[in-house]
């Protein structure tokens, strides 16, 4: 019985891990599906304007759009500036 319990409990843990991973993937996909069509171009243009004035790598800038309510959107811009 102990051997059977071992395998059954492992399947539950594996199933829970798989379920959690799937939930994360679905949440990420929903996050990007809610972005407006103009958002990728907006990111590129913001990055190009910043690069005009500050010499930085593109990975040092993150742009994120969060939806708080149906009528409120928040555009978050994080820039790691060089010394």
Curated annotation (Swiss-Prot):
One of its GO terms (biological process) is cell division. It holds the Pfam family MinE. Signal peptide: none annotated. InterPro entries: MinE, MinE_sf. The keyword Cell division applies. Keywords: Cell cycle, Cell division. Coiled coil: none annotated. Prevents the cell division inhibition by proteins MinC and MinD at internal division sites while permitting inhibition at polar sites. This ensures cell division at the proper site by restricting the formation of a division septum at the midpoint of the long axis of the cell. Belongs to the MinE family. This is Cell division topological specificity factor.
């Amino acid at each position: 019985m102990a051997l059977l319990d071992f395998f059954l409990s492992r399947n539950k843990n594996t199933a829970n891990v798989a379920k959690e991973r799937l939930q994360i993937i679905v949440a990420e996909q929903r996050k990007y599906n809610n972005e407006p069509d103009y958002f990728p171009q907006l990111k590129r243009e913001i990055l190009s304007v910043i690069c005009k004035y500050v010499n930085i790598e593109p990975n040092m800038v993150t742009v994120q759009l969060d939806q708080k309510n149906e009528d409120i959107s928040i555009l978050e811009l994080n820039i790691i500036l060089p010394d």
